[in-house]
Amino acid sequence: MGINEIIMYIMMFFMLIAAVDRILSQFGGSARFLGKFGKSIEGSGGQFEEGFMAMGALGLAMVGMTALAPVLAHVLGPVIIPVYEMLGANPSMFAGTLLACDMGGFFLAKELAGGDVAAWLYSGLILGSMMGPTIVFSIPVALGIIEPSDRRYLALGVLAGIVTIPIGCIAGGLVAMYSGVQINGQPVEFTFALILMNMIPVIIVAILVALGLKFIPEKMINGFQIFAKFLVALITLGLAAAVVKFLLGWELIPGLDPIFMAPGDKPGEVMRAIEVIGSISCVLLGAYPMVLLLTRWFEKPLMSVGKVLNMNNIAAAGMVATLANNIPMFGMMKQMDTRGKVINCAFAVSAAFALGDHLGFAAANMNAMIFPMIVGKLIGGVTAIGVAMMLVPKEDATATKTEAEAQS
């Protein structure tokens, strides 16, 4: 049994615990029947429900872009392919740079990869779980949640996170190379050359984004927000066209992928968008309760991380929450000290969703890549913390130290 299978078994263990809690909550609660242990698992049933209800949000984000993937590859290919080949990289890296793995990046990467499975997985699942989500999701969502005065800390944190994405990608690629990833019994050939050469365009983009966030942060952040709005419009167009094609047979956009199983598809080998979403939700039934219960059971050691990083408990809790979803963390930012704000935003660039949606997506689509993806995301997040600690303005760092001393 490999590490990827072990991770799946652990999540299913937590899924069963959460299912028990949901059942017992109908009759007075887990504590009533299971005593102290029951009290420790209360609330996991609610996370069980959250995991399944995520299907709707996932569908809105994924289905349209998944259907559009071959169309976008056909339109963008003539421009993207020559540029990336000139840099010595596979064109699939374009997809993971701009799109999250679960917002079309994985499927567009496959279309652009030209049959190179390793490059497809490297972009679609490793890069596409770090840079893509930051640009199309995290920054636009954060702007709608955080206080306007915290935008400068968001920019600093994202800057720290972006520049360490290549480190996380290389780490994930090396784990994939040494763990012997296989698809349908066939080995996927990750090589040093592939891992390093495909980082060239990523490093260029990371440097440009970092320079923009350093010198024109407001304009860069607003630019990401505008890009995200256009992306939502494109995804909605694709979703509407795909549904019309499925229900009426009208092909409003030629070349769309089916969103349900089509004639010729082999069950278990080919999964279309709707089935993929269902599979992700099944994984999230266990992933969400797992994060809740591990956070509760290991609260003291997790909170001690905050002391090591010299930030308050709210900031430490935000980092833990980020591993499942970064939206709660952004909601907590106004209660964090300055150092904690920058560190959390930096950590979220790579590490967000590592034990949430991205874990569910990898498990549903390519479970051989679960461990490489998680390792890459965590190393990217941890190294981003180191950079963030150097970027906190001196006057703010002094204020943070005073706040930390007051807490203790």
From Swiss-Prot:
It is a multi-pass membrane protein. The chain crosses the membrane at residues 1-21, 61-81, 89-109, 126-146, 155-175, 192-212, 230-250, 274-294, 313-333, 342-362, 369-389. It is found in: Cell inner membrane. InterPro entries: EutH. One of its GO terms (biological process) is ethanolamine catabolic process. It comes from the Bacteria. It catalyses: ethanolamine(in) = ethanolamine(out). Pathway: Amine and polyamine degradation; ethanolamine degradation. Pfam families: EutH. GO terms for cellular component: plasma membrane. Keywords: Cell inner membrane, Cell membrane, Membrane, Transmembrane, Transmembrane helix, Transport. The keyword Ribosomal protein does not apply. GO terms for molecular function: ethanolamine transmembrane transporter activity. Its main location: membrane. Probably involved in the diffusion of protonated ethanolamine (EA) into the cell at low pH. At low pH most EA is protonated, and this permease becomes necessary. Belongs to the EutH family. PANTHER family: ETHANOLAMINE PERMEASE EUTH-RELATED, ETHANOLAMINE UTILIZATION PROTEIN EUTH. This is Probable ethanolamine permease EutH. It comes from Escherichia coli (strain K12).
